[in-house]
UniProtKB/Swiss-Prot annotation:
InterPro entries: P-loop_NTPase (IPR027417), UTP25 (IPR010678), UTP25_C (IPR053939), UTP25_NTPase-like (IPR053940). Its main location: nucleus. Belongs to the UTP25 family. SUPFAM superfamilies: P-loop containing nucleoside triphosphate hydrolases. DEAD-box RNA helicase-like protein required for pre-18S rRNA processing, specifically at sites A0, A1, and A2. Residues 1-174 are annotated as: Disordered. Component of the ribosomal small subunit (SSU) processome composed of at least 40 protein subunits and snoRNA U3. This is U3 small nucleolar RNA-associated protein 25. GO terms for molecular function: rRNA binding; U3 snoRNA binding.
Length: 731
């Protein structure tokens, strides 16, 4: 069964460059994942057709480039080269036979395979898309390709090898040199929720809570701030370019970088327009560093096993499948921004299918949105399609877009796009083995994903790091022990960036972030959205607290309080003499769609509200009905208007005619508080009257996270625990 989109039948159409809603949809062929790893070129081509240029073409080009390089000393013409190519190659092989195996011997082997590679180039491109993940056979092919480019023999690469030999490198301590007994001890502690916490404050009024497994050992010391890239264990290839784009770390960044590059989980609840690009560059640098170190470790171990064939080597350096990084994003345009960060940090000579990527993922901003808020334009600007997926594969010289998932290093996807791949339409076959070896998972703009369908996020994380159903040609002798023991989810690093934290995001932090290295939560200290109201006159803002015994009963308790304490006064103010309707201009803001349906049905059927005329706008309301409801409300034909938070998130309407605001619940996004209250001032002539009507909001103790953002951190405690009254007013 196809997963629900999460926006329902809303009229908020995506504006993708080609109008598509992701691969395999609207007449396209369904995506399929191959169960083999390294296929012969005569195998059936992928039905996905995602790979574009073939691997064979690149290899053949590299062969030609290498032969040209070796033959550069000859001044003979082309015909003479053709006549003497075999004797020359034979002579070259004899010359190289006595040389050091670390250098020319590799190139000799490359020349020996050149004719074979050229044959592969002749094959159909789609046949070559049936490549597999990072198995022994494919890495041998890659190794030959990399040898030609100098990955293992150049002096520059030799400098990089020092990073991998550094015992203090977090990559080594977290993934390679793992004490199995200590790992198991930490896992047992985590399974019983035996976390020990340390609290700290960061510059800029940020609160940090570090949790780590309490194994009874020495106290965990908070890492010192990182003041520059030189303090990080970066591959030289990245360090050479990162300094051009990532300046000296600011106070907040310097405090968080050690946790990110130290492979600890991070929940950052203070993402803003000003810091989003900085953190995006940081996590892109981190995942690139991880990919390069993983790849080079496998290549070097392959070289070692070839040099010592008689030795019984224990080389545990791989997972079950190739993909190591998963980045979850809300829109295609957000994916473009991440890819741009990756490409500026990883200088590739070639980018295969780059034009196709920008044609299908990027779009121009809507010029009619110039009056929209900045956060809206950042989220929905460009291509706002929320169903996509993209595989990226990295070689020494090339970034390959649209690589098959099982042949990719990084997977970028929206929750819906990933869910559509994991669950086939026929419901008969599920495929999520490509998520079995994810070692770094990133969720960016988590607050935006909440407004899509958070259940997709929960579904994806519940399928991360599971034992694969099929072997996919895996060489189990090279798989790390903690993969074989089913412990990968305790080693995986998860990074979540959000503008604010909700109960759903907290649940993800508690239930899916089990990193044995520890996890960190960062939240800001809030001054309160009530202080930033865009009106020229003061507005009375009243908060009414109702009692609720549990989160499960909260919807019923809220509805009971609304109908008994709030609705009665609304009906009186909206009814004139003789029971005739009187326009009151009351906007009823409802965060939850389920609550919206409940209130709407009650207003339509209850005898208590038989004289109350109202309109309703939700995320599922058609454009025509939205226009009609807004017109009737502005003209006074409707006394009240129901309005949901998700509607405001997707459309940011400016509702005119508002003289009073009732909030059935406070919004999750604190920005919405000022925007909704600001409706009172859209008609300058009635601003004073609207200010008298003011705002009334309902809340319970289960709304603590939302209320902190609205009223401020310092005021929250008294409002939740105050026993002297249940009503709080601010002007």
């Amino acid at each position: 069964m196809v997963a629900p989109r999460g926006r329902g039948s809303r009229p908020f159409n995506s504006r993708g460059a080609r109008g598509g809603r992701g691969r395999g949809q609207r007449g396209g062929r369904k995506p399929r994942f191959e169960t083999s790893r390294v296929e012969e070129v005569h195998h059936e081509a992928s039905s996905d057709g995602e790979s574009g240029l073939s691997e064979g073409n690149v290899d053949a080009e590299d062969e030609v480039e290498l032969i040209d390089e070796l033959s550069s000393g000859s001044d003979d013409d082309d015909e003479e080269d053709k006549k003497t190519s075999k004797p020359y190659n034979t002579l070259l092989q004899l010359f190289n036979a006595g040389q050091d195996t670390n250098g020319p011997a590799r190139k000799r082997r490359k020349v020996e395979h050149s004719s074979k590679k050229t044959e592969v180039q002749i094959k159909e491109p789609e046949e070559l898309d049936d490549e597999a993940d990072l198995s022994e056979s494919e890495i041998e092919d890659d190794e030959e390709d990399e040898d030609a480019e100098g990955i293992a023999v150049d002096e520059g690469e030799a400098e990089d090898s020092g990073d991998e030999d550094d015992a203090t490198d977090p990559f080594e301590t977290h993934f390679s040199n793992v004490d199995s007994s200590l790992l198991l001890q930490k896992i047992n502690v985590i399974s019983t929720k035996g976390w020990k916490t340390h609290k700290n404050e960061l510059p800029g009024k940020f609160r940090l809570v570090l949790s780590h497994p309490d194994t009874g050992g020495d106290a965990v010391q908070l890492p010192p701030p990182a003041h520059g890239l030189q303090s990080l264990k970066l591959k030289q290839k990245l360090a050479n370019h990162a300094g051009d784009h990532i300046a000296k770390f600011e106070s907040l960044t310097s405090g968080l970088v050690p946790y990110i590059f130290g492979y600890q989980d991070l929940l950052f609840g203070a993402r803003t327009l000003s810091n989003s690009a900085k953190f995006r560059d940081l996590y892109c640098l981190h995942v690139l560093n991880h990919i390069l170190k993983t790849r080079d470790r496998v290549l070097k171990n392959n070289s070692r096993s070839q040099k010592e064939p008689d030795q019984d080597l224990e080389l545990r350096d791989q997972g079950f499948t190739r993909p190591k990084v998963l980045i979850i994003l809300p829109t295609r345009q957000a994916c473009v921004r991440v890819v741009e960060s990756i490409t500026k940090l990883y200088h590739a000579e070639q980018q295969e299918n780059k034009s196709r990527f920008y044609d299908t993922f990027s779009a121009a901003d809507d010029k009619s949105w110039e009056d929209k808020p900045d956060d809206f334009r950042e989220l929905f600007g460009g291509n706002d399609d929320d169903m996509f997926r993209l595989g990226l594969k990295f070689t020494r010289k090339t970034i390959k877009y649209f690589s098959q998932f099982y042949n990719s290093d990084i997977i970028l996807a929206s929750p819906l796009g990933l869910r559509m791949v994991m669950d086939k339409e026929d419901g008969k076959k599920q495929d999520f083995d490509f998520l079995s070896s994810i070692e770094v998972a990133v969720v960016d703009q988590a607050d935006a994903l909440l407004m899509q369908n958070w259940e997709h996020i929960e579904y994806v994380f519940s399928h991360l790091n599971l034992q694969p159903k099929e072997s996919h040609g895996c060489d189990f002798s090279r798989v790390r022990n903690w993969y074989l023991d089913g412990q990968a989810k305790y080693v995986r690093q998860t990074l979540v960036f959000s503008s604010f934290i909700t109960p759903e995001i907290n649940a993800l932090f508690s239930s899916q972030m089990h990193n044995t290295a520890g996890k960190v939560k960062v939240t800001p200290t809030y001054e309160g959205a009530i202080l930033d109201i865009p009106l020229p006159v003061p507005v009375k803002q009243t908060f009414s607290r109702f009692n609720s015994t549990s989160p499960v009963k909260d919807p019923d308790d809220r509805f009971k309080y609304f109908t008994s304490a709030v609705l009665s006064s609304l009906v009186r103010s909206s009814t004139g003499s003789g029971g005739k309707p009187h326009a009151s201009g009351t906007l009823i803001f409802i965060p939850s769609y389920l609550d919206f349906v409940r209130v709407r049905n009650y207003l339509a059927t209850s005898s208590q509200t038989e004289n109350l005329s109202f309109g309703a706008i939700s995320e599922y309301t058609s454009v025509r009905d939205v226009a009609r409801a807004r017109t009737h409300f502005f003209s006074g034909r409707h006394s009240a208007l129901l309005y949901t938070e998700r509607t405001h998130h997707f459309r940011r309407y400016q509702i005119r005619g508002v003289k009073r605001v009732i909030m059935y619940g406070v919004p999750e996004n604190p920005v919405f508080w000022g925007e909704i209250v600001g409706f009172l001032g859209l008609d300058p002539a009635g601003t004073a009257e609207a200010a008298e009507g003011g705002v009334r909001a309902l809340f319970s103790k289960w709304d603590a996270l939302k209320m902190e953002r609205i009223v401020g951190t310092k005021r929250l405690g008294n409002m939740l625990m105050e026993k002297g009254g249940d009503t709080f007013s601010f002007v």
